[in-house]
């Protein structure tokens, strides 16, 4: 009672209430009521972010392995339907992971699949090799995207090495596990990866967290890949 929507033609009172429930009060207050998020309440400080210049690194070197991960965000509300495709370049000599690509945008499942396969082609053109492993979430009905990705990959002759991932641990705990990697410079970013950095700096209070979720997935895949291979010199 007593509530008045300033622009009812854009969002109804019901829409706003639903958004507040699905996105959380802190994210809603920041996005819709212009109440800024307190950085002290977030898990990642912008001062922790360390950067690299792609022009200064030879990603064609044999020591690099590439790990990808997709958070498709299928079935979520229309206001939070970003999908994230993160590609990490792991330097197996130093153990440092470079965020080679951070693609976070709104798109339909068919476009997600097409973009993943295009990144495989781009890796092969620019580095001489494709993904060592690519993780795709299979929670709930997201499994169908992984299956379709495999079929389309084979159809196009790419044969992407796909690993289905069913997440059972709380997302907040998973993303929080990135803290020491980011803080200690074990994960390096490009300065132009602004949306990923923004989502990290606002986690867990921001409206969107698809980028951090996919980053954690790629990081975890890379660690498992290293443990399963006869590599030396990894410092974590």
Q: Model segments located where?
A:
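ATPase catalytic-site recognition across NTP-hydrolyzing enzymes
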Residues: 1-72
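Mg2+-dependent endonuclease catalytic cores in nucleic-acid-processing enzymes, primarily RNase H-like
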Residues: 1-9, 14-18, 35, 39-43, ...
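Helicase-core coupling region on the C-terminal RecA-like lobe
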Residues: 31-39, 211, 219, 235-236
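Flexible internal linker/loop segments at domain or repeat junctions
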Residues: 57-62, 90-96
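An active-site-proximal beta-strand-loop segment
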Residues: 70-83
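Generic detector of well-ordered alpha-helical packing
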Residues: 72, 138, 210-211
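Acidic two-metal-ion nuclease catalytic site recognized across multiple nuclease folds
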Residues: 218-236
């Amino acid at each position: 009672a007593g509530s008045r929507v300033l622009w009812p033609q854009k969002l109804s009172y019901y829409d706003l209430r639903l958004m507040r429930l699905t996105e959380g009060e802190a994210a809603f207050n920041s996005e819709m009521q212009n109440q800024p998020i307190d950085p002290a309440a977030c898990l990642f400080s912008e001062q922790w972010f360390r950067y690299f210049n792609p022009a200064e690194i030879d990603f064609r070197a044999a020591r690099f392995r590439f790990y990808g991960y997709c958070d498709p965000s299928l079935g979520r509300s229309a206001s939070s339907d970003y999908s994230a495709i993160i590609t990490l370049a792991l330097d197996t000599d130093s153990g440092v992971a470079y965020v080679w690509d951070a693609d976070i945008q709104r798109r339909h499942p068919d476009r997600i699949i097409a973009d993943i396969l295009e990144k495989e082609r781009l890796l092969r053109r620019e580095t001489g090799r494709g993904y060592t492993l690519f993780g795709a979430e299979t929670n709930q009905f997201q499994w169908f995207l992984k299956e379709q990705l495999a079929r389309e990959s084979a159809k196009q002759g790419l044969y992407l090495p796909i690993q289905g991932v069913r997440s059972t641990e709380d997302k907040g705990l998973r993303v929080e596990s990135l803290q020491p990697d980011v803080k200690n410079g074990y994960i390096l970013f490009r300065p132009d990866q602004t949306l990923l950095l923004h989502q990290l700096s606002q986690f867990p209070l921001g409206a969107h967290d698809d980028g951090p979720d996919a980053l954690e997935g790629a990081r975890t895949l890379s660690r498992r890949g290293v443990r399963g291979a006869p590599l030396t010199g990894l410092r974590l």
